[in-house]
């Protein structure tokens, strides 16, 4: 399972429809569970680092992270699932995450050095999860 933990408001509007369409296509272990927190509450939650290293692999989305290909992302997720762990993806609010969160995460993932609107970025994350699933299973969605 993939937990996506977000700072800010719930998915809404046209983006939520696109996200829902990708979610319908996802199969275990790529299924998604969303958690939304007001930004301050999310930062307080992360101070306590509520994740279990043995069972959860934490990916922090941040423009200061590592930029990887879809194939590399698929390999990361496949490896995590093969080791019996779940994935947690952290998506920050307007101010992102501080250094302590980035340092504790197993992987800091950058889509780009650009900053994206929250709803668009969440949509892109879900699309990449679907793409990773399809790469892993040899589907026709991803083309090289």
In which residue ranges do the predicted regions lie?
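Structured adenosyl-cofactor binding patch, chiefly the S-adenosyl-L-methionine
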Residues: 99-143
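Short hydrophobic segments within beta-strands
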Residues: 5-7, 61, 90
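N-terminal beta1-alpha1 ligand-phosphate binding loop
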Residues: 1-22, 26
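S-adenosyl-L-methionine/SAH cofactor-binding core of RNA-modifying enzymes
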Residues: 27-88
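Short, aromatic/basic amphipathic alpha-helical patches
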Residues: 17-24, 47-50, 101
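Short glycine-rich anion-binding loops that position phosphate/pyrophosphate groups of nucleotides
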Residues: 10, 63-66, 93-96
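Conserved strand-to-helix beginnings and helix N-cap segments that scaffold or border functional pockets
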Residues: 15-19, 70-74, 102, 122
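Catalytic beta-strand/loop module used to bind and position nucleotide/cofactor moieties
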Residues: 72-99, 107-116
């Amino acid at each position: 399972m993939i937990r996506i933990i977000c700072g800010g408001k719930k998915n809404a509007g046209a983006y939520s429809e696109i996200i829902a369409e990708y979610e319908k296509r996802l199969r275990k272990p790529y299924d998604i569970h969303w958690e939304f927190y007001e930004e301050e509450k999310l930062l307080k939650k992360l101070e306590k680092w509520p994740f279990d290293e043995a069972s959860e692999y934490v990916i922090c989305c941040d423009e200061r992270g590592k930029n990887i290909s879809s194939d590399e992302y698929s390999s990361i997720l496949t490896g995590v699932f093969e080791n019996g762990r779940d994935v947690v993806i952290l998506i920050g609010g307007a101010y992102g995450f501080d250094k302590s969160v980035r340092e504790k995460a197993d992987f800091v993932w950058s889509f780009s050095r650009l900053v994206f609107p929250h709803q668009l970025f969440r949509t892109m994350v879900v699309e990449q999860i679907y793409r990773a699933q399809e790469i892993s299973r040899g589907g026709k969605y991803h083309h090289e």
